């Protein structure tokens, strides 16, 4: 009887050691890295009283990052995105419905997002973090229409706006946190809402002037992937985003009119809206 008891104790110890080894192995499988190559379509609108503009720009986009395991309650993610080689689009300006100006428009952006994940239950997570964004809006090839003359931005001018933003973000995510599920198919997604805590925009037309603005943004994204081999998935990524910028406070500026006269006046950032569709092929791995 004592021998059987010893065997049971030894078996329990061995089983415990095996379980610990399995737990350690499982922990090594948590988290993953990813790389996305795709295209981004941006629809941008500016809204002045009685005056509005719109443009739609397409550009290639790279998105890379990963999800990193901390413990049973927390993970964190880092995402870095950049667009490049934008396809120039025509921006149209209308006053009370009448076309008054067109110009070529290019849009580029780069962003880095860091989020802490709190695991609620199963695959559901609460997100909180921050992000840094940099956007450029380039305009050139201005043409006036229907007798309108732009007194600030003249035909033949090229001008560029550069915006730097720091956002506080919060949201909700659905993610298993690993690539080793029972099914070969895997679904993940997240929704994030953010407000800027620091936002500065400069326009090359007005030297040494900075515009401070406020607004909000939100986006929803999802990935559907299939396991090619253990630890490697290929899939498709889709993200829909919306950003709102409110009109900024006016700044005192100096400029040269279309007729060559030096003048002073006020300038401000108009209310603006940006819709974004980002989609592409995504690879995820953990080896």
Can you annotate each of these PLM segments?
Residues 21-92, 269-287:
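Short glycine/proline- and aromatic-enriched beta-strand/turn motifs that initiate or cap beta-hairpins
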Residues 151-214:
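Short helix-loop boundary/capping segments
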Residues 22-31, 68-77, 116-126, 177-187, ...:
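Short loop/turn motifs that connect adjacent beta-strands in outer-membrane beta-barrel proteins
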């Amino acid at each position: 009887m004592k021998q059987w008891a010893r065997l049971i104790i030894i078996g329990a110890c061995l089983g415990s050691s095996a379980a610990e080894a399995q737990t350690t192995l499982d922990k090594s499988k948590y988290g993953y890295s990813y790389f996305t190559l795709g295209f981004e379509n941006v629809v941008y609108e500016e809204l002045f009283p009685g005056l509005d503009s719109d443009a739609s720009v397409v550009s290639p986009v790279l998105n890379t990052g990963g999800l990193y395991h901390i413990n049973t309650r927390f993970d964190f993610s880092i995402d870095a995105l950049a667009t490049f080689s934008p396809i120039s689009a025509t921006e149209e300006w209308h006053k009370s419905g009448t076309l008054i100006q067109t110009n070529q428009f290019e849009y580029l952006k780069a962003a880095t997002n860091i989020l802490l994940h709190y695991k609620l239950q199963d695959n559901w997570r609460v997100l909180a973090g921050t992000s840094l964004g940099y956007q450029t809006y380039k305009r050139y090839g201005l043409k006036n229409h229907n007798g309108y003359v732009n007194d600030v931005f003249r035909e033949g001018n090229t001008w560029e706006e550069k915006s730097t933003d720091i956002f506080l973000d919060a949201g909700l995510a659905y993610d298993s946190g690993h690539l080793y599920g029972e099914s070969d198919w895997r679904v993940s997604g997240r929704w994030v809402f953010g407000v800027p805590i620091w936002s500065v925009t400069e326009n090359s037309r007005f030297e040494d002037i900075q515009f401070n603005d406020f607004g909000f943004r939100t986006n929803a994204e999802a990935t559907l992937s299939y396991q090619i081999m253990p630890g490697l998935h290929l899939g498709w990524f889709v993200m829909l985003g919306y950003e709102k910028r409110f009109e900024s406070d006016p700044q005192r500026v100096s400029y040269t009119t279309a007729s060559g006269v030096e003048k002073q006046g006020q300038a401000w950032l108009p209310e603006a809206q940006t819709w974004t569709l980002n989609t592409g092929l995504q690879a995820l791995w953990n080896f």
